[in-house]
């Protein structure tokens, strides 16, 4: 990964000591402030349970190193840790990642986290067995996923698609076009793909594998 100047914070959470690596300089401090404010509550903003698509398909994923992009409060990454994966979570919000560690402690697992500005981040090639990214849209980063996977590694991506605009005030730039995930990850072998629309939400999900 890109070498950012970092320093370490040691925090104690009800008996658990963990290391959270924090970048010294963030290019988008306004984003950090906005998400830190959102996560500054005891309640988990998006709940503690993982997304169903991940639970339903976890048996397909190769065991090993997971990179959880935009981890937030950790519901998906922590779930994978309970399933025996080694999890590194990245997010711009230190407060969100602190809650992720609390959730990991609650589930008797450990995770590693790093505070980064994903809009100025480069993934290390051939490093991860699984790359997980849910409800975070950054297409230039998506394009790095294939090279960052080990041969045989898989991506798991789920986020809102254009039909979601029917149900919520939501910026068009954060919504996928129809079948866009299939186009973005056309170099990978599609294992699972779905478009979901229940009349309240609409999103697309994909699991795809890098060739051996």
Identify the function of each model-found stretch.
Residues 137-149:
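A short, conserved alpha-helix within the catalytic core of class I
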Residues 196-212:
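Core SAM-dependent methyltransferase catalytic element
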Residues 121-130:
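A short acidic, Gly/Pro-enriched loop at the edge of an enzyme's catalytic core
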Residues 93-95:
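Conserved SAM/SAH-binding beta-strand->alpha-helix loop
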Residues 64-72:
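Conserved class I S-adenosyl-L-methionine
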Residues 153-164:
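Conserved beta-strand signature within the Rossmann-like core of class I S-adenosyl-L-methionine
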Residues 86-91:
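Conserved SAM-binding motif I beta-strand of class I
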Residues 107-118:
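Conserved SAM-binding strand-loop segment of SAM-dependent methyltransferases
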């Amino acid at each position: 990964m890109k070498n950012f100047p970092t320093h370490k914070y040691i925090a104690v959470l009800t008996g658990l000591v963990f290391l959270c690596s924090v970048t010294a300089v963030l290019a988008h401090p306004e984003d950090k402030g906005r998400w830190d404010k959102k996560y500054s509550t005891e309640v988990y903003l998006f709940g503690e349970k993982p997304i169903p698509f991940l639970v339903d398909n976890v048996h397909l994923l190769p065991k090993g190193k997971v990179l959880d992009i935009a981890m937030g409060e950790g519901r998906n990454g922590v779930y994978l840790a309970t399933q025996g994966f080694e999890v590194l979570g990245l997010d711009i919000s230190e407060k969100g990642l602190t809650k992720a560690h609390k959730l990991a402690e609650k589930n008797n697992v450990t995770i590693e986290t790093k505070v980064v500005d994903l809009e100025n981040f480069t993934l290390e090639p051939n490093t991860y067995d699984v790359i997980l990214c849910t409800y975070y849209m950054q297409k230039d980063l998506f394009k790095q996923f294939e090279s960052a996977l080990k041969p045989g590694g898989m991506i798991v991506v789920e986020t809102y698609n254009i039909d979601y605009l029917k149900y919520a005030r939501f910026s068009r730039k954060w919504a996928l076009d129809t079948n866009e995930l299939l186009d973005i990850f056309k170099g990978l072998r599609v294992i699972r793909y779905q478009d979901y629309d229940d009349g309240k939400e609409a999103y697309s999900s994909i699991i795809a594998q890098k060739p051996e």
